């Protein structure tokens, strides 16, 4: 089984490392044609506006909207998966959620927190860097974790989204969960 990581920006190598530690093949996705070779896709963090522009430029948006591909979005990747972002439309419209950008503050307000993530573990380390939070969930969306009352992890069908950066820690259990419960099922 091959798991792709969208390689337009973000911690691509770190995500691939987590895929490999989970026992699977990880590949950097740089061209739209590569999407046909994978079983699931991770959308990494970075800057969400830049990520959307690059996805438009290289033709990823249309292809990803058409494909029925399991996807896992971290930080900016979560924003890209959302149906609504603050007071604007979403991008890929895969998760029935509304996201608020940078809701934990600026870069200097970055922090780490131990998270209890339903169905995965109660001791996951979350790295929050200019992180969004999920302000609203619609029917069919399962809340997996909160920090300070703010929703930071959800799943819906074959889509998983988190506000933080699991790839910046040595703990690959979230990636393994995505592969083994949302792709292999």
From Swiss-Prot:
<dbReference type="InterPro" id="IPR021196">
    <property type="entry name" value="PdxT/SNO_CS"/>
</dbReference>
<dbReference type="GO" id="GO:0008614">
    <property type="term" value="P:pyridoxine metabolic process"/>
</dbReference>
<dbReference type="InterPro" id="IPR029062">
    <property type="entry name" value="Class_I_gatase-like"/>
</dbReference>
<dbReference type="GO" id="GO:0042823">
    <property type="term" value="P:pyridoxal phosphate biosynthetic process"/>
</dbReference>
<feature type="active site" description="Nucleophile">
    <location>
        <position position="75"/>
    </location>
</feature>
<feature type="binding site">
    <location>
        <position position="101"/>
    </location>
    <ligand>
        <name>L-glutamine</name>
    </ligand>
</feature>
<protein>
    <recommendedName>
        <fullName>Pyridoxal 5'-phosphate synthase subunit PdxT</fullName>
        <ecNumber>4.3.3.6</ecNumber>
        <ecNumber>3.5.1.2</ecNumber>
    </recommendedName>
</protein>
<dbReference type="InterPro" id="IPR002161">
    <property type="entry name" value="PdxT/SNO"/>
</dbReference>
<keyword id="KW-0315">Glutamine amidotransferase</keyword>
<dbReference type="GO" id="GO:0006543">
    <property type="term" value="P:glutamine catabolic process"/>
</dbReference>
<comment type="pathway">
    <text>Cofactor biosynthesis; pyridoxal 5'-phosphate biosynthesis.</text>
</comment>
<comment type="function">
    <text>Catalyzes the hydrolysis of glutamine to glutamate and ammonia as part of the biosynthesis of pyridoxal 5'-phosphate. The resulting ammonia molecule is channeled to the active site of PdxS.</text>
</comment>
<keyword id="KW-0456">Lyase</keyword>
<dbReference type="Pfam" id="PF01174">
    <property type="entry name" value="SNO"/>
</dbReference>
<dbReference type="GO" id="GO:0004359">
    <property type="term" value="F:glutaminase activity"/>
</dbReference>
<comment type="similarity">
    <text>Belongs to the glutaminase PdxT/SNO family.</text>
</comment>
<dbReference type="GO" id="GO:0005829">
    <property type="term" value="C:cytosol"/>
</dbReference>
<dbReference type="GO" id="GO:0036381">
    <property type="term" value="F:pyridoxal 5'-phosphate synthase (glutamine hydrolysing) activity"/>
</dbReference>
<keyword id="KW-0663">Pyridoxal phosphate</keyword>
<feature type="active site" description="Charge relay system">
    <location>
        <position position="167"/>
    </location>
</feature>
<keyword id="KW-0378">Hydrolase</keyword>
<feature type="binding site">
    <location>
        <begin position="129"/>
        <end position="130"/>
    </location>
    <ligand>
        <name>L-glutamine</name>
    </ligand>
</feature>
<feature type="active site" description="Charge relay system">
    <location>
        <position position="165"/>
    </location>
</feature>
<dbReference type="GO" id="GO:1903600">
    <property type="term" value="C:glutaminase complex"/>
</dbReference>
<comment type="subunit">
    <text>In the presence of PdxS, forms a dodecamer of heterodimers. Only shows activity in the heterodimer.</text>
</comment>
<feature type="binding site">
    <location>
        <begin position="46"/>
        <end position="48"/>
    </location>
    <ligand>
        <name>L-glutamine</name>
    </ligand>
</feature>
